[in-house]
């Protein structure tokens, strides 16, 4: 019995410090992406999504690191920590779904997309993503007693079911758009495979393997804490990997082998020349994106 308890304590400590290490590196990478996309690269329709996605990941990782330090110092974890960190994770999920769907539509219907898409559609959609997500997480958390000591038995199930259903639908929409894009680019499209296509698929693979455990934990938190307590620290670690790895994907796809370049050039190449053309109001050459 004591051996199992000691083994669990060791495992929990190892995962905790791994999460802290990953979380410390993630804000640096996402901060560099934020700086370059926000101030050094002309904003195009897809770079705006990546800018907001980097902001959501930066906030998630910063909160995660701050709360981990507080947990280590105080020796206890408040449910408020999970609610606030999951809030920024949820914003990232919304943004990734919108980004994947728009990237898919731009490849399936390029002529219609270029002619009918409003110039500031990406900025408007990102603003619409942030606005409803901010209450979408705290409301069910408050009703179910995660933000206070008492729960509302009549209201909690309805809020929780609606929240869980919505997040699972978003994950499915993002993944479906990615699968359609993969099949189209691989089997049907005659144009060269774009780098931005790799960003979409890389982000969706991260979501599937590293992000969905957090959605499941949000959905089944009391049950998982009782039946599988190991799930919570692992889901937290994987969520940090999900948010920290996206800058590495951008860098890997945009960097030329054997050359040392500033991050601005790497990001511009990963996004494609169409990002700059779109920012000047010209038509988007979708084959370049």
From Swiss-Prot:
<dbReference type="GO" id="GO:0004930">
    <property type="term" value="F:G protein-coupled receptor activity"/>
</dbReference>
<keyword id="KW-0297">G-protein coupled receptor</keyword>
<dbReference type="InterPro" id="IPR027336">
    <property type="entry name" value="MRGPCRG"/>
</dbReference>
<dbReference type="GO" id="GO:0007186">
    <property type="term" value="P:G protein-coupled receptor signaling pathway"/>
</dbReference>
<dbReference type="GO" id="GO:0005886">
    <property type="term" value="C:plasma membrane"/>
</dbReference>
<feature type="topological domain" description="Extracellular">
    <location>
        <begin position="64"/>
        <end position="78"/>
    </location>
</feature>
<feature type="transmembrane region" description="Helical; Name=5">
    <location>
        <begin position="164"/>
        <end position="184"/>
    </location>
</feature>
<dbReference type="InterPro" id="IPR000276">
    <property type="entry name" value="GPCR_Rhodpsn"/>
</dbReference>
<feature type="transmembrane region" description="Helical; Name=7">
    <location>
        <begin position="222"/>
        <end position="242"/>
    </location>
</feature>
<keyword id="KW-0675">Receptor</keyword>
<feature type="topological domain" description="Extracellular">
    <location>
        <begin position="142"/>
        <end position="163"/>
    </location>
</feature>
<feature type="transmembrane region" description="Helical; Name=2">
    <location>
        <begin position="43"/>
        <end position="63"/>
    </location>
</feature>
<comment type="function">
    <text>Orphan receptor. May regulate nociceptor function and/or development, including the sensation or modulation of pain.</text>
</comment>
<feature type="topological domain" description="Cytoplasmic">
    <location>
        <begin position="100"/>
        <end position="120"/>
    </location>
</feature>
<feature type="transmembrane region" description="Helical; Name=3">
    <location>
        <begin position="79"/>
        <end position="99"/>
    </location>
</feature>
<feature type="topological domain" description="Cytoplasmic">
    <location>
        <begin position="243"/>
        <end position="289"/>
    </location>
</feature>
<feature type="topological domain" description="Cytoplasmic">
    <location>
        <begin position="185"/>
        <end position="195"/>
    </location>
</feature>
<keyword id="KW-0807">Transducer</keyword>
<feature type="transmembrane region" description="Helical; Name=1">
    <location>
        <begin position="14"/>
        <end position="34"/>
    </location>
</feature>
<keyword id="KW-0812">Transmembrane</keyword>
<feature type="topological domain" description="Cytoplasmic">
    <location>
        <begin position="35"/>
        <end position="42"/>
    </location>
</feature>
<dbReference type="InterPro" id="IPR017452">
    <property type="entry name" value="GPCR_Rhodpsn_7TM"/>
</dbReference>
<dbReference type="InterPro" id="IPR026234">
    <property type="entry name" value="MRGPCRFAMILY"/>
</dbReference>
<feature type="transmembrane region" description="Helical; Name=4">
    <location>
        <begin position="121"/>
        <end position="141"/>
    </location>
</feature>
<keyword id="KW-0472">Membrane</keyword>
<protein>
    <recommendedName>
        <fullName>Mas-related G-protein coupled receptor member G</fullName>
    </recommendedName>
</protein>
<feature type="topological domain" description="Extracellular">
    <location>
        <begin position="1"/>
        <end position="13"/>
    </location>
</feature>
<comment type="similarity">
    <text>Belongs to the G-protein coupled receptor 1 family. Mas subfamily.</text>
</comment>
<keyword id="KW-1003">Cell membrane</keyword>
<feature type="transmembrane region" description="Helical; Name=6">
    <location>
        <begin position="196"/>
        <end position="216"/>
    </location>
</feature>
<feature type="topological domain" description="Extracellular">
    <location>
        <begin position="217"/>
        <end position="221"/>
    </location>
</feature>
<keyword id="KW-1133">Transmembrane helix</keyword>
